[in-house]
From Swiss-Prot:
GO terms for biological process: potassium ion transport. Pfam families: Asp-Al_Ex, TrkA_C. The lineage of its organism: Bacteria, Pseudomonadati, Pseudomonadota, Gammaproteobacteria, Enterobacterales. It comes from Shigella boydii serotype 18 (strain CDC 3083-94 / BS512). This is Putative transport protein YidE. It comes from the Bacteria. Residues 191-276, 279-361 form the RCK C-terminal domain. Keywords: Cell membrane, Membrane, Repeat, Transmembrane, Transmembrane helix, Transport.
Amino acid sequence: MSDIALTVSILALVAVVGLFIGNVKFRGIGLGIGGVLFGGIIVGHFVSQAGMTLSSDMLHVIQEFGLILFVYTIGIQVGPGFFASLRVSGLRLNLFAVLIVIIGGLVTAILHKLFDIPLPVVMGIFSGAVTNTPALGAGQQILRDLGTPMEMVDQMGMSYAMAYPFGICGILFTMWMLRVIFRVNVETEAQQHESSRTNGGALIKTINIRVENPNLHDLAIKDVPILNGDKIICSRLKREETLKVPSPDTIIQLGDLLHLVGQPADLHNAQLVIGQEVDTSLSTKGTDLRVERVVVTNENVLGKRIRDLHFKERYDVVISRLNRAGVELVASGDISLQFGDILNLVGRPSAIDAVANVLGNAQQKLQQVQMLPVFIGIGLGVLLGSIPVFVPGFPAALKLGLAGGPLIMALILGRIGSIGKLYWFMPPSANLALRELGIVLFLSVVGLKSGGDFVNTLVNGEGLSWIGYGALITAVPLITVGILARMLAKMNYLTMCGMLAGSMTDPPALAFANNLHPTSGAAALSYATVYPLVMFLRIITPQLLAVLFWSIG
């Protein structure tokens, strides 16, 4: 059997063993996708004992490509809601994540001085304990630049392998422990997160208001500032027994009932100006109007603003709200349409059908993946991650790497949505398949590489003490910040799990957090919110520690 065939076969075996381990649950808790790492360690041990030789170049390519696939699909998934989340809760999340990095660095420094751990070993333990491969590479590079002998630099890789498994287990254990301590109901947490997911952090509501302000009598809707802005949509007007779709030129009269869509604060302001809320139904049932959800799939309208399509004027149809990647938005005229946007239309059946034809509404297109944008995005992400950033006083240039670059590029492209006929929408099923494939490939190789010398170092060397040091570096920051975030900041549990996973730049932990409630995007969103800054800090922290320890040691 050729080296390539043998390598592929072993990787498949690792995936099977690891996924089986991940599916084993104790009291409802399992390793999930993280089991693949331990499958790799087990198989790697026996492969080493059997004297098999695998293609190291192929393993390296598979490991990096798997990581790229995982972070890219995460970025595409959360991109549309990432920047809105950053505005609403990003500062708080990033402050907690930075605190985890700082505490981890302090624990590492204390262990280095107390137990006189060699510099390459303690840096490897630090990188493995926070499950950050780019930190390992950055640390090895600066050690070489500082003149450290190569045999000492290689020790960093072994100590990394010792600490890495508990780095993953530690964060999973922390999530489980916090869930038990605070008696978390995951379903309730998911519902609470869902209720706060909008552009401005407040749920989109509807309200029926009676026109009671005499100053508004015989005014056109376009002449009433609160109704002519982008914060509130007036989607229906009822006068006596007649229900119709209002246009900007529609004249309102005292006693008219208006159906308004917007955020609670804006609707409250509308009440103060227009009149009181009423319980009268403005349902389209029994009328010649209907409400329908239509999806944007026509390439000709991508990137166009809602106001430029003139649906009110041409078809007498109102867009009452817009759903983008699960986030409900007020359909203001300045919003540009993206592929996959879901619009709520109100109008007559024939008019809605005409607007649906303009928008596309081709459901089958939602199941298709444009592969050209996928590889354009990955390519641009790799280029971004390869750009060196030179900082005065640092002997090695800083880079985002193959994990940070594709993630940030995917966030940007996911937010842009489309450029011309290229769109970065990816069906959820395809996104999940690529994401799971990527993380399985990545962890399989990491496990295989760690498995060969893992048992020998663990039994006959200093492996146990290294694991103990790594456990402290992993657990102390996570538990401390987790308790603070829940008790002081009242942070949503799923959001907190994503933040903890992101602070460790730990894809398996994110996969575990996602599986806590598969339909909630809370963990993925908070993970992506803190990941870019944390990745940068994780890359420079070992370099800072190396320079600090080298100068004082």
